[in-house]
Each structure stands twice: as C-alpha cells, then as structure tokens.
Amino acid sequence: MATFKDACFHYRRVTKLNRELLRIGANSVWTPVSSNKIKIKGWCIECCQLTGLTFCHGCSLAHVCQWCIQNKRCFLDNEPHLLKLRTFESPITKEKLQCIINLYELLFPINHGVINKFKKTIKQRKCRNEFDKSWYNQLLLPITLNAAVFKFHSRDVYVFGFYEGSSPCIDLPYRLVNCIDLYDKLLLDQVNFERMSSLPDNLQSIYANKYFKLSRLPSMKLKRIYYSDFSKQNLINKYKTKSRIVLRNLTEFTWDSQTDLHHDLINDKDKILAALSTSSLKQFETHDLNLGRIKADIFELGHHCKPNYISSNHWQPASKISKCKWCNVKYAFRDMDWKMESMYNELLSFIQSCYKSNVNVGHCSSIEKAYPLVKDILWHSITEYIDQTVEKLFNTMNPVQVNEQQVIKFCWQIDIALYMHIKMILETEALPFTFTLNQFNSIIKGIVNQWCDVAELDHLPLCTEQTDALVKLEEEGKLSEEYELLISDSEDDD
C-alpha cells in the first residue's frame, strides 16, 4: 500500500527537479492535523494513500489527508507542483494521457542506475539487499491511467494517480475512473513491460500483479458535486453575508494550457524550477452566493418557518418575533444571510396582509389549511412548482369572481418598504384594493427574486474556479457581493 507515497520519498533524491516536485506532506516529520471531526475515508489525491480525509484549504472539498493538508496545496492552484502536474480538465485526450505517462517516466524511472542507487542507500542489514518488497516498494510503481474525477457543474477535473486499495465512496466528492480505453491498452502494457524489465524476477511478478490489477479496474459512475460536499469551516459571517476564505498557491509564470506546462517540464526544466521557487500562498475572500447555497438556505428557512404569523396581529417583522410561541423564529436567523431574512419578512408580511383581508381569523394560535402551503411557497420558491403552489395558496383566501377573473381583497396594513416594493413589482403608482392571481403570483416571485436572479447564479461556490480565474475576478472587483462593496464605499466616504 501507499506505493506512490514511498516512491515520492525515495525518488526525491534522484534529481534536482525531483527534490522540488516530490515533497509531499505525507513524507514529512510534521505532526498530523487532528481530524477527529472528519469521518470521511478515501484516497488523498496528493499522496494517493487510503486514509482519513480532511477538507482542502483551496477548494473546501474533502480530498487531502491530515499530513498533506499542511502543504496547503490544491489541484486548482497555478503553481506547477506535482498535484497540479497530475491534473487535467475534460475532455481527456490521448495527448493529455501521454503527458501523464511522460511525467511518470521522468520522475520515477526504473533502470539499472536507479536500482543500484537504491541498493547503496538501503544497506543497514544484509536482508535489505535481497530486493524484498518491504524495502523496494518504491520500484513497484506501475504507470496506470486511473484518475480521481471531480464532476463540477460545467466541467470535469481529472487528478491522475496510483490509487491502491478499496473503500466505499459514499461521502467522497470524487470518483475513480480508468482512462486506459482512451489511450491504448497494448501500448500501456508495453510501457510497463519495458519498465519492469530491469527489475529482479521476484519484484517483476509483484510489479506485474499490481499493474494488471489496477490498470483493468472498471470506472465508477461519476458523482456530481453539490453544495453539501463543501466544508463550512472556512465560511465567515461578514455584514450578515457569508464569505469563504480560500488559499491558493500562485506563481508569476503562466502557461496557455496544461499540455504546454508538461512540454516545459520535459524541455525547459529551469522554467519549472523558477516557477516553484517564486511561488507564494495567497488568500482570497470569495462570496458564497450560489444556487447550491440558496437552495440550502431556503430549505432551512422553510424548515424553521412559522406560518402561524399570517393569522396573527403582529406588526413586527416575522423574524423579530420572540415572545410568541406560535411565531417565534428569532433564533433561526442568528447565522442566516440577511437576504434570506429580508425575503422571509416581506413574504410573510404580504401573505399576512392578504390572508387577514380575506379570511376571518383573529389569532396566530388558529389552525389554518394555508399553513402547509406557506412552507411550500418557500421550498418551491426557486423551482418549477412555484406557480401551482401560489395558486393553491391563492385559493385558500376565498377569491371571488369579478369580470371573469378570480380576485382577492387587499386592505390590511403593510410596511412602507414593502408597499414601495410591491408598487415597483406591479409597475403602478398606487396599489389596487384587489389582486388577481397573476398579480399575486408576480408579487410573490418579485419578493423572492429581489436580491438575486436565480437564473444567473453559479451552481457551485467560487472556490471551484481555477486560480487564474480568481485572480481575474479579484482585479475586476467581483469576488465580493455587491452589498459588501456598497458598505465598503460608504465607510470610505466617511
């Protein structure tokens, strides 16, 4: 097990390039980071060992072990470290697979010179010169085309490595696939037969067994990454708006593509070494506004919602009620985004005004058939079921027929800010005393979509973007939400 980790440890003494590239946290003497809270077991994509995983500082996904986490490396960095060199984005072509094979042959060669070098370093006891598997595990690294695949919404990212062992992948953000069919089985067999030809007979059999066992593995079904896969440990609440702290390794050197980077690895090693020596760790504070988080917040909002508010005589906003056992949800908004709180207040205040205008109800302790529909309005607010849910709620308010249209009365007091917002939604100078179903539907949707256009939101957080993209967004001032920027501007004005 951990053949890749052992190979990185021993081969780092072979060349100067190896000494810079093969430094991984799993081979260091650092104390491992405590991972008692993390119950995810899988393959660390940096050292390829099967162990307990923790969340990466760069992408907030669980893919790094408690030793490698101290290097703070991510496969989305632009520094050409080993993890980055093993990473390719879809589509995977034969040219990209050839780059992986060339990388292995460059960093982990097997020839008589390398074998003799290892014989000289392993000489404490006589048995260590007998080519036992225990002492020469680093020579048993076959070249395979297995990869851990992260399936983001619009792209797939492949991290190639030698992943040994088996483990259930229930909680892992990635799945293991075998890309040998995209290359050539016989050609890859020939590459490995040539590598193992220099090995002693007893190691050849072990090498061949490892190679054929892993190179013929079937691919797993890819798993799409959702917002729940990301860590919440690096989220901060700033102005009641959630931001995410992301750490990335930057270098001054740039490459147009990953294949160009591999071309320089073969033909211009000095450029790679210069890039590694000038790299730095940079912190980004990115907004966490995305469709995945909006769905999670709305689900939580619907779970904590107290629909009894629509029957009450409370004049305070729904989120501020604290002394009514039927309407109290104040504790639920301690960590909630302010936009969710604003939406909740306006939505329940508007529904309260409509409900009290049309239904004879006097207290929030009443049991009404509209209560489940209020929760459904929240849960379905950004789904395709919102129209039929709004219609059901509309029908509970005893609509009457006027000029061949169903209408409800609107004659209950509302907040001035909500009054102005409804005027803006309906594009009218004065609010009518009756609402049709279309008007009622438009107001509900307008309140929900006030702070963000769901159609334009990214599906996943910005921490899934490449480092170059984060740098560009930072230069354009798009890493923070507009609300945070407005606050910053007002503070500067003072």
UniProtKB/Swiss-Prot annotation:
HAMAP family hit by this protein: ROTA_NSP1 (MF_04088)
Function in brief: Plays a role in the inhibition of host innate immunity by inducing the degradation of key host factors required to activate interferon production such as IRF3, IRF5 or IRF7. Associates with components of cullin RING ligases (CRLs) including CUL1 or CUL3, which are essential multisubunit ubiquitination complexes, to modulate their activities.
Molecular functions (GO terms): metal ion binding; RNA binding
Subunit structure: Interacts (via C-terminus) with host IRF3; this interaction leads to IRF3 degradation. Interacts with host IRF7; this interaction leads to IRF7 degradation. Interacts with host CUL1 and CUL3.
GO biological process: symbiont-mediated suppression of host cytoplasmic pattern recognition receptor signaling pathway via inhibition of IRF3 activity; symbiont-mediated suppression of host cytoplasmic pattern recognition receptor signaling pathway via inhibition of IRF7 activity
Species per Swiss-Prot/TrEMBL record: Rotavirus A (strain RVA/Monkey/United States/RRV/1975/G3P5B[3])
The entry's keywords: Host cytoplasm, Host cytoskeleton, Host-virus interaction, Inhibition of host innate immune response by virus, Inhibition of host IRF3 by virus, Inhibition of host IRF7 by virus, Inhibition of host RLR pathway by virus, Interferon antiviral system evasion, Metal-binding, RNA-binding, Viral immunoevasion
Record region (Important for cytoskeleton localization): 84-178
Ranges where the record places region Zinc-binding domain: 44-81
Region feature Interaction with host IRF3, mapped onto this chain: 320-494
Main location: host cell
UniProt motif pLxIS motif: location: 485-488
Domain notes: The integrity of the zinc-binding domain in NSP1 is important for degradation of host IRF3. The pLxIS motif targets host IRF3 for degradation; however phosphorylation of NSP1 pLxIS motif is not required for its activity.
Annotated protein name in UniProt: Non-structural protein 1
Pfam families: Rota_NS53
Family: Belongs to the rotavirus NSP1 family.
Lineage start: Viruses, Riboviria, Orthornavirae, Duplornaviricota, Resentoviricetes
Residues covered by region (RNA-binding): 1-83
InterPro entries: Rotavirus_NSP1
Compartmental location: Host cytoplasm, Host cytoskeleton
Cellular component per GO, a single term: host cytoskeleton
Transmembrane segments: none
Superkingdom to which the source organism belongs: Viruses
